[in-house]
A protein has these predicted regions:
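Aromatic-rich carbohydrate-recognition surfaces in CAZymes
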Residues: 1-114, 143-144, 151-154, 158, ...
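Active-site core of glycosidic bond-cleaving carbohydrate-active enzymes
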Residues: 2-30, 79, 83, 87, ...
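Beta-strand segments within the central parallel beta-sheet cores of soluble alpha/beta enzyme folds
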Residues: 22-26, 93-103, 121-127, 264-268, ...
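Acidic/His metal-coordination segments adjacent to aromatic residues that form catalytic metal sites
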Residues: 51-69, 124-139, 276-290
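Acidic/histidine-rich catalytic neighborhood
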Residues: 104, 108-167
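Non-catalytic C-terminal accessory modules of carbohydrate-active enzymes
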Residues: 260-443
Length: 444
């Protein structure tokens, strides 16, 4: 599931959100009983997703360690829900499907987090992050940040589906306090994020882990920290690492405007992984062959083109676009991108300028288009038009639900330093949705 939710799903979401929604149905409806059973078998509340599953949702992985320790998979799936909300603002779907998953996976992390009186924060012990070379660690930074993302989304679900979830504000307060209290390791001497408690610089890792905090997790951090993470973890990553590692390093260097380093990592992200005669992706480089037809590697290359050189970021209430041309090319064309019923293509020209072409659609998009600081309205129903820019564009959602707001993810705050009144009374607002009477209960 990690491969699907983190690498494949985000690409499909931008190109065809209807198909993306159908893919989420497997996680929200089909395997509901199995994920409840998985958590109960580990004496943990909420929903716990398997590392790998088939039709039943039961664990089918051939790697027991993944099932036992790589619990970030549960938060990875909730992260896919977060991205779907960013891209579609589909609150009706949230009520019928998403709330139950978002809230019950957050409940899982409420039980998984352990209070540490010495730090007045929460730890997540005995986990393995994406880096499987260093298993069973304390406070893996990727896992902790993903868990915090999940907890904030769970609190948001409690607001959106307030009338269907029998909760008090104190319950949602506790969810937010746990999220903000999760440890986020940062070493001031060196200004970087240790991958886990006790990590020593120079220790080898299997694949990108702490580097993922910048993208795709989009955690707010200092540029210097982002740079140091790339410099520290790049040289110690195993030569047998999958293509996704170097795709994420490419995007990281692009965020820092280090175009030469980005180009080096771009070549490293695909050239060793393609197999002739049809350039099929392999899980490993030539000297370390792995699974053939490795779709996750191909998907990560699309991340590099769409989110890296295309510069696209999905965030709460907006899509940010900061495009640039890939090295050795004269044009970058992404034929279809969707954001809240606004369908468009993106083309980057040789001089670095770009064009957003709105495609004719039967409904009026509820967005504002800001290009190089100038605001534009989308063209009318069933009408195509183009917008030109030089530096960046932002598509902003108009008329978002003001009654429920997804709070920004923040961690590493002592409980004593947190404001206890973090949740306000919220209602669903004026939007009309069906009442599915979701069977959600809360027990820490």
């Amino acid at each position: 599931m990690w491969d699907f939710d983190m690498w494949i799903f985000p690409v499909i979401l931008l190109t065809d959100p209807i198909v993306a929604r159908e893919m989420l149905t497997y996680r929200t409806r089909i395997i509901r009983r199995a994920v409840q059973s998985n958590a109960a078998s580990n004496n943990i509340g909420g929903w716990q997703y398997p590392w790998a599953s088939a039709f039943t949702g039961r664990e089918v992985t051939s790697t027991p360690g993944a099932a036992e320790l790589q619990h970030h998979i549960t938060a990875d799936i909730a992260f896919a829900i977060r991205l779907y909300l960013y891209a579609t603002d589909n609150l009706s779907w949230m009520v019928t499907d998403g709330c139950e998953l978002a809230f019950n996976t957050a409940r899982f992390w409420m039980r998984r987090a352990v209070y540490n009186s010495a730090t007045d924060k929460y730890d997540i012990p005995t986990v393995t992050g994406p880096d499987t070379m260093n298993p069973n660690v304390l406070n893996n930074v990727f896992t902790n940040v993903m868990a915090a993302h999940n907890l904030f989304l769970g609190e948001y679900a409690g607001c959106v589906c307030e009338s269907f979830i029998n909760l008090k504000n104190e319950d949602l307060n506790e969810m937010i306090r746990t999220a903000r209290g999760l440890r986020l390791l940062h070493e001031s001497n060196g200004d970087f994020n240790p991958q886990f408690e006790g990590y020593v610089v120079g220790r080898q890792i299997a694949q990108a882990d702490a580097v993922l905090l910048a993208y795709p997790l989009d955690l707010e951090m200092e540029q210097s920290t982002k740079r140091n993470n790339l410099n520290i973890y790049g040289p110690v990553t195993s030569a047998s690492s999958s293509a996704m590692t170097w795709s994420m390093h490419t995007i990281g260097w692009l965020e820092l405007d280090e175009l030469t380093l980005a180009a080096d990592n771009l070549r490293r992200s695909y050239q060793p992984y393609l197999r002739s005669p049809f350039n099929v992706w392999n899980q490993g480089p030539v000297e370390f062959p792995g699974a053939p037809n490795y779709v996750s590697g191909a998907a990560s290359f699309l991340h590099t083109m769409i989110n890296g050189y295309g510069g696209i970021r999905l965030r709460d209430g907006e899509m940010v676009i900061r495009p640039r041309l890939p090295p050795g090319t004269t044009r970058l064309s992404i034929p279809t991108i969707n954001f809240n019923r606004f369908r468009f293509s993106l083309e980057v020209q040789q001089d670095g300028s770009f064009t957003i072409r709105q495609q004719a659609i039967p409904t009026m998009p509820t967005i504002q288009i800001i290009i190089d600081g100038v605001s534009h309205e989308p063209c009318g129903i069933n009408t195509a038009c183009a917008f030109h820019g030089i530096n960046s564009a932002t598509l902003k959602l108009v008329g978002a639900n003001a009654n429920c707001q997804l709070k920004p993810t923040e961690l590493n705050i002592r409980l004593a330093d947190q404001n206890h009144a973090v949740v306000t009374s919220c209602t669903y607002g004026d939007r009309s949705v069906a009442d599915p009477k979701l069977p959600i209960e809360y027990n820490r």
